[in-house]
Amino acid sequence: MLPRVARLNTHLVSLALLGFQITYGAITYQHPDDLPSDVDYDFIVAGGGTAGLVVASRLSENPDWNILVIEAGPSNKDAPETRVPGLAGSLPASRTDWNYTTIPQDALGGRSLNYSRAKVLGGCSSHNSMVYTRGSKDDWNHWADITGDQGLSWDSILPVMKKAEKFSKDFSNQSVDGHIDPSMHGHDGLLSVVSSYTNVSFNDLLLETTKELSDEFPFKLDLNDGNPHGLAWTQYTIDHRAERSSSATSYLESTRDNVHVLVNSRVTRIFSAGNGTDFRSVEFAVDANSPKKVLTAKKEVILSAGVIASPQVLMNSGIGGREELQAIGVDTLIDNPSVGKNLSDQAATLLMFDTTLPNTDYDVAAALTEWEDSRSGPMAYGARLNHLTWVRLLDDKLNGSDPSSGKNSPHIEFQFMQISHQLPPADAPNQVKLPDPDSIGAVLLLAVVNLYSVSHGSIILNDNDPFANPMIDLNMFGDQKDIAILREGVRSARRMFSSQAFKDVVNGTVYPPADVTSDEDLDAFLRTSAISYWHGVGTLSMSPQNASWGVVDPDFRVKGTSGLRVVDASVIPYAPAGHTQVPVYTFAEHASVLIAKSYA
């Protein structure tokens, strides 16, 4: 999640990028009536997001299989703004967003939160901040233990991540010596990754801090080596041409013509044969007023609609808790109360420090023209600042309970965003008094993130209308441990910018005000300022075969069914130490192998 850049008229962006051509082997259809009537599909992928396009691409390697992808949003070809790295901050709440809102959060004083989810081919990989983080070794080893699939352990899964990755220098061909460990990366995969950076004075000061405060903020050569603790150069899913690399631009562009993609059509339900347990028929429509169509897969349906929509589709299909389904008038075919539960996300707050450092503001329209002309300039970068920091709290700050995956996992992330004259947007929570713009020169803006929330939320349906948004309850700060950890994160950030390196250029926080220091005052600030970091997972969690909890088995099959698997963020048991993009790609790569092997 990043603060939005100045809003651009998407029509003007489209005009500016009119000559921008995107090609791939898959055949794209704009309307259900356009689908060929003489093709029987072996696999139907319900959702063309990050995971769905990976699965479709990998299955297409078998030339005898025909695959159909059904995506609710438009093609990324029709949303060229998704290709420009510097426009990432303008995509939330745009035409390529579902624009979800949570229900009022009790621990936040009844505030509802915006909950951005992508509605475009490529899903969140076409829409996110492009940060490339794998999580910790502890995360993967713990996921392997709790799912019963040792194929997810770090040592087993690292080759999968490397296989998918194509690390290279960025458009500027700058050296990455001292920025990454080349041995930790793949160089021949489909997904482009760079470690692009700008030469701002802030970089040098941060690196000085890693020497002065090395216990809390050590320098980390590569944030993706499995032990993410310290300050590191950020890596992004951007290619060497300074364009976003998404599942649509990487995986889909490499597919064959045995993949058909239907955009602008929403999967509403998955039907079973004779109301039994074999689910292979997909119902879909353009909108609530359009006729519904049904297609049946010869082999399987792969549900890949995301952490919000996948449980919604299952519940509307009769898979969920019996009492909940009865309450909305849906017949229960598979009674599983775990469906829609266990929503795991990360809580964050923005911090602003008064600073005399040079600002990183730029003219967005001029920068877009520069990018369009030469694929260079501010729009070519993933962010205006170049580092992430991960902090592991001391045991005495955890009150005897460690929510992380293990001793090599951090509790807190700092994502440095920009140095700007702009204050938070008008729609940001501002019950805490914002500074007078005339009283400060510029502000250093960063996000402080609690990576491991103890509190889990849920997805619940209001009714059986498949086009109605579900109720999203993050249950943010439902457990007091979560706000306590984020509070310590704020204090950690203040220690960083009280270091000798910053003493002459950073003058303390203005959001929250510098005098907000006690537990009580910081908690009050966090209850009015906390936001979701939009890294939700877990609503259809994977669990061991025959477990009494969870929704999918380690082979990604929905428990108690045949013909139906789920492959997306919803199956990941809890959010990792970092961003969720790479785990979603990796789970999808892993699932693709398992699916293909089952038909070998």
Curated annotation (Swiss-Prot):
Gene Ontology molecular function: flavin adenine dinucleotide binding; pyranose dehydrogenase (acceptor) activity
InterPro entries in the cross-refs: FAD/NAD-bd_sf (IPR036188), GMC_OxRdtase (IPR012132), GMC_OxRdtase_N (IPR000172), GMC_OxRtase_C (IPR007867)
Annotated positions of the Tele-8alpha-FAD histidine modification: H127
Compartment annotation: Secreted
EC assignment: 1.1.99.29
Keyword Oxidoreductase: yes
Catalytic site: H535 (proton acceptor), H579
Keyword terms of this UniProt record: Carbohydrate metabolism, FAD, Flavoprotein, Glycoprotein, Oxidoreductase, Secreted, Signal
Signal sequence residues: 1-25
Cofactor note: Binds 1 FAD covalently per subunit.
Record note on modification: N-glycosylated.
Main location: secreted
Catalysed reactions listed for this entry: pyranose + acceptor = pyranos-2-ulose + reduced acceptor; pyranose + acceptor = pyranos-3-ulose + reduced acceptor; pyranose + acceptor = pyranos-2,3-diulose + reduced acceptor; a pyranoside + acceptor = a pyranosid-3-ulose + reduced acceptor
This protein's GO CC annotations: extracellular region
Glycosylation sites: N99, N114, N173, N199, N275, N342, N399, N507, N546
Assembly with partners or alone: Monomer.
Family per record: Belongs to the GMC oxidoreductase family.
Name of the featured protein: Pyranose dehydrogenase 3
Biological source species: Leucoagaricus meleagris (Western flat-topped agaric)
Gene name of the encoded protein: pdh3
